[in-house]
């Protein structure tokens, strides 16, 4: 009798939300992700001879990555496709190819031959404004850097992100673009309308995309202006559907072996992990923490003295909304099992880059980033068989420096 009274008392003490979480949920058979980007490209004139060597990220245009994962095995050879609306101007459908994953060769040693400790320093700045703030820069000397210092210096902001479909996470997997179809998305292409995913290893997925979940507006920079104090004032047009903005810049220091980095965050943050899709709830949190700029922001000034040369790259991202769907909807009866057939995530971002440079008389070297003036987009590169893992703190000094030196051409 006492045990029954105690159990009843415990149940009464539990809050209603906790009691409601007792509904049994079976995970979806299929998970479908659409990663949709509008890339503004380089908001500047390209020096002769360099345009052909520019990576796809600098060329601008609309891009899309489609990933389908399923817990079902394929009946015969795996095949699936995404039937698209006519407004996308890419035919009736896009093939979701299942990549042939080859076993990686066995490494005979855990050592990493060929790694040479870099020379020079990294100078880390942050914050918008005319002048550098007290306590900056944080200086990292590669010659004396140990893994613990690297972990502190290169630690990125913790972001809560779901993990999308990938060959290692799904029994059967399909992706686009791929080796059979890597067509570029037309400049006027639109996602608005009805979509259907079908195949021999997935339940049929049907959904509609509205205006807010279509490709975001391209980021358009105004002329970069050098202030009387030597700072670089960068302005951009407001992106209507943006949930927030973030910017980073990098360049060479006065010493040729020095790398200078800056971010728009109000607190110390290198920001490399933030230059990607981020869920809206996380963007809201980062705005409260003064890491991400609110969506009404239209300008940021890189402080004077951060970049001494006019060869520094300014990278910018406008975060977009997400469309998240589950089929069938959750039963209202908590005793009924929620057997999910499929889930969909459509995530959005708009990116651009420009040089922190100005001509005499206040005219920036180049022009604003605008899709109307760009050439036809290049074909999208097919994705690798699996998504790369985020580097561990112990790898930060190696991977971070390799990436930055590669960008700077050293």
Residues covered by each model-derived region:
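Sec/Tat signal peptide C-region and signal peptidase I cleavage site
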Residues: 16-22
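Exoplasmic/lumenal beta-rich domain surfaces
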Residues: 253-303
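Exposed aromatic-hydrophobic patches
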Residues: 182-185, 298-306
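Short, aromatic- and glycine-rich surface loops/edge beta-strands on solvent-exposed regions
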Residues: 181-204, 309-323
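Solvent-exposed N-terminal domain segments of exported/luminal and surface proteins
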Residues: 24-178
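Proline/serine/threonine-rich low-complexity linkers at boundaries of modular beta-sandwich domains
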Residues: 204-216
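Glycine- and small hydrophobic-rich membrane-insertion segments that are intrinsically disordered
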Residues: 39-59, 68, 72-74, 270, ...
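Conserved aromatic anchor
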Residues: 232-241
């Amino acid at each position: 009798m006492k045990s029954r009274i105690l159990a009843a008392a415990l149940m009464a003490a539990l809050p209603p939300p906790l009691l409601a979480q007792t509904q049994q949920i079976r995970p979806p058979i299929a998970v479908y992700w659409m990663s949709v980007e509008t890339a503004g490209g380089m908001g500047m004139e390209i020096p002769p001879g360099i345009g052909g060597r520019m990576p796809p990220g600098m060329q601008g245009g609309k891009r899309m990555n489609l990933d389908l994962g399923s817990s079902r095995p394929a009946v015969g050879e795996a095949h699936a496709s995404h039937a698209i609306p006519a407004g996308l101007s890419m035919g009736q459908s896009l093939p979701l190819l299942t990549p042939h994953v080859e076993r990686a060769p066995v490494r005979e040693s855990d050592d990493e031959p060929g790694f040479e400790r870099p020379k020079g320093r990294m100078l880390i700045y942050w914050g918008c404004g005319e002048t550098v703030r007290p306590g900056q820069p944080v200086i990292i000397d590669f010659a004396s850097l140990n893994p613990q210092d690297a972990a502190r210096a290169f630690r990125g902001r913790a972001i809560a992100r779901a993990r999308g479909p990938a060959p290692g996470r799904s029994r059967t997997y399909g992706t686009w673009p791929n080796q059979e179809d890597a067509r570029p998305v037309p400049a006027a292409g639109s996602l608005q309308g009805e979509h259907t995913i079908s195949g021999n290893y997935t339940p049929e997925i049907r959904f509609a995309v509205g205006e807010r979940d279509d490709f975001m507006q391209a980021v358009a920079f105004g002329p970069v202006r050098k202030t009387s104090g030597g700072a670089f004032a960068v302005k951009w047009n407001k992106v209507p559907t943006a949930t927030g903005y973030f910017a980073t810049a990098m360049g060479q220091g006065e010493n040729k072996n020095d790398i200078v980095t800056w971010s728009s965050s109000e607190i110390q943050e290198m920001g490399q992990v933030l230059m990607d899709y981020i869920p809206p709830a996380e963007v809201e949190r980062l705005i409260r923490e003064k890491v991400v700029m609110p969506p009404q922001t239209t300008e940021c000034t890189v402080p004077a003295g951060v970049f001494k040369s006019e060869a520094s790259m300014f990278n910018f991202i406008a975060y977009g909304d997400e469309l998240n769907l589950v089929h069938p909807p959750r039963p209202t009866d908590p005793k009924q099992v929620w057997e999910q057939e499929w889930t969909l995530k459509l995530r959005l971002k708009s990116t651009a880059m420009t040089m922190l440079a100005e001509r005499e008389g206040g005219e920036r070297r180049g022009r604003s980033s605008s899709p109307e003036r760009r050439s036809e987009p290049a074909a999208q590169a097919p994705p690798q068989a699996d998504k790369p893992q985020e580097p561990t703190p112990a790898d930060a000094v190696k991977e971070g420096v390799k990436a930055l030196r590669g960008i700077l051409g050293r």
